[in-house]
Every structure is written in structure tokens, then in C-alpha cells.
Amino acid sequence: DDLLEAGTVGITGVDTRALARRARGGMRVGVFTGEVGPVSELVQTVRATPDGADTLISRASTSEPYRVGEGEPAVAIIDLGLGRELAETVRRSGAPALVLPASATYADVAASGAARVLLSGGPGNPADATTALGLAREIVSARMPVLGFGLGHQILARALGFATEPLLRAHHGANHPVQARESGHVDITSHTHSYTVDFAGSPDVEITHVSLNDGSAEGFVARGKPVAGLQFHPELGAGPSDAHHLLDSFLKDA
């Protein structure tokens, strides 16, 4: 009744675990509500819907730049879909920021006057995020300090030449334990990703964080370059021991 009153779509009487297993992988799935047409028309609608990361990111990103905090921006945030959440966390940290749309160019970043760049999380397969990947390569080449979260982490890794691949079991939820390899400290973190980076034991990066659930890489720092990534989302602040300190560390000199 509460869902109906709020106009919120819900589902009941369905084995959601079985549904998740069926939909896992590369299957294209459409969810329809209300009055629907013949199945053949629904299938055609799903097939005709663009599913590339560039399309998904552009829909989720801000359409116009906007400022967060007082003063000249110290940080430029590239909004790949979760930019607003990241901007709010940056604001609370006291660092003025300029949030740029996913379509921003390196010239836009340079013109912002910001000394550091954050790549937010967002939707889609990182291998298809060609616009964001091009920007990331320019940022890395210019040696601007940059930190990516979620999709941003994956795109930075690809900009450094690493491959990404689907996880056997996607990470979603607000209770994933992640351990910092150097200190052994464990944070309970928010995850929203279906892909992981294959660092393949490369000497060019240091793996800083790992998942305690499946051992996958959850953070890296590039050796000799001011580039770092976190596969999880400190800005979503899950759990009693959230990971805001990792973002604060990046911002402290901003």
C-alpha cells in the first residue's frame, strides 16, 4: 500500500535470487511496468535500446558544469553518473570543486584551474566508455593528480593499459569488507560494480586494497605517476567504519 501511494514500482511473489542468476552475464534485460504490449514488441524495444557505456554515462551525468563550495575550485570532478554524491562529500571536506559533465574535454579540465581531478563512479562496461577513456588518457599524460572511484577506477586502469573483465559474481551492496594491504585496516564499503581490473601482477602498479570476499583488487596506485583508483565508493559511506579518510587523504593538499 505504501509503495502504491508513493507511486513506486515494486515486485512480489518472485524468486529474486533465481531471477538474478538468470539475468547474470551478458543478457540484455528489459523491465516493463503498467500496461504492456505483445512480447514480440517488448523484445524489439529491448533490442533497440542503446546499451553502450557512453550512452548510459551521458544519461546519468550532469548536463552542465556546476560549482560546489566557496572559492576557486581545487578539484575538478568528472561526473560519470555518481558525481553529485562525490561532490557532496568533497564539499563536506572543505575543498571547493567544479563538477564537469562526462562530455568534458581536457581543455575544460585545464581551464577549471583545479590542481586535482576525481573521476566518479557510473554505469556500464568500462571497455565501451570511449569518451571517458580518452579524457583519462589525457589527464594521465599531463601528470595531473587523479583519483577514480568505481567506473572511474576501471577507466584509469584502462588508460594505463590494463584490461577489465566481468566478475564471476558482481559486487553490489553496502557491506563489502575491503582490506588495506599495507596497514591491514578493514573498511566496510559500498560496491556497485560488475567488472574488475586484471592487473596481472604488473610491477607498474601497487595493489593497495583487496576484497576479503573474493580477493579481487579494490584499489591501486600507479608507480611513478600521480594516478590512483578505488573500486569501491567512499563517498557512499557504508558501515560504521566508512572510508571517507581515503578521499580526505587525496584532498588534503587541494
Name each model feature, range by range.
Residues V9, A74, P145-L147, A163, ...:
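Proline-centered loop/turn at the N-terminus of a beta-strand
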Residues H185-G224:
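Catalytic beta-strand/loop cores that center a nucleophilic Ser/Cys/Thr
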Residues A111, R116-S194, G239-F250:
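Cysteine-nucleophile active-site neighborhood
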Residues I78, L100, L167, V210, ...:
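Hydrophobic residues at beta-strand termini and immediately following loops
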Residues G219-A254:
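A glycine-centered loop/beta-turn motif at secondary-structure junctions
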Residues D1-A95, L100-S103, A107, S112, ...:
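RNA-binding accessory domains that recognize and position tRNA/RNA substrates
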